[in-house]
């Protein structure tokens, strides 16, 4: 069936579902997005807007790179009145042990082979990148200056929503949707419609300060071993997640910074912290389980699902991240989860 005559229903008006709807409509499909609460009402409404190409698996490197290229001119693509404000602050991944540094070396080698300008840095250079960073107990780290974040990521979600035919309706059964194809992109709620998929809620909390005039933390700093990530936004607010004690131990200048504002959300996590993409059965497709990196990959995922549904194309990501991998023992663990 051609794209011009195909009717597609998308369940979920988060950034992934809306991106899929955008790419389907761009290729001539008739698309309706069903959402039970509101545009960006789930994880897409609270995500901090980070975009990076530093990953430990080939599939994520490719999805992130394509998405970053798409985002480069997102304001023109979506006819946005508001500038979403991309800031290339850089991402610094810290390694506290030789084992963690060895994993970062493997990841950087993979990234470099795919055109990502990341590199391993010694503790002395980490101290230059992040003034006042305590490096005595660091083995090194990985750095990419081109990674960054959007000041207003929700503006992108809203712009995608404005271009879509979004209907507030709770889909209780896929049988009620009479479209030629159905895509379930409902994040943590996906198992309500596809209970066979191993997606579970993983609570996350973001803490924010009031605006601070002084720039205390310029790049985004991540410590997977100590369980935290932090950055300072363009408006001066400090944004942090995870272990505050570990954060101030590594960055003593932040010890007196209060973080009175809390934003609670959930990751739609899978056993390997990778998305589930592809056909589930007959006319039913899924794009969920992004484990916190849906915004970073949404543009590429939209293109891949649209081409698969309308043109029968099978992207590499559909082979790697297919729903059957869990039952078949083909998990693809991602080592660089924040």
What residues fall within each predicted segment?
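Dinucleotide-binding Rossmann-like beta1-alpha1 core, especially the glycine-rich loop
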Residues: 48-129, 227, 246, 251
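Short hydrophobic core segments
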Residues: 9-11, 178-189, 302
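N-terminal Rossmann-like FAD-binding beta1-loop-alpha1 element of flavoenzymes
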Residues: 7-32
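C-terminal catalytic lobe of FAD-dependent flavoproteins
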Residues: 253-338
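Active-site substrate-recognition segment that forms the wall
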Residues: 22-26, 51, 82-87, 188-282
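Helical element adjacent to the flavin cofactor pocket in flavoenzyme catalytic cores
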Residues: 143-174
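Glycine-rich FAD pyrophosphate-binding loop
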Residues: 25-45
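Conserved Rossmann-like nucleotide-cofactor binding loop
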Residues: 16, 39, 189
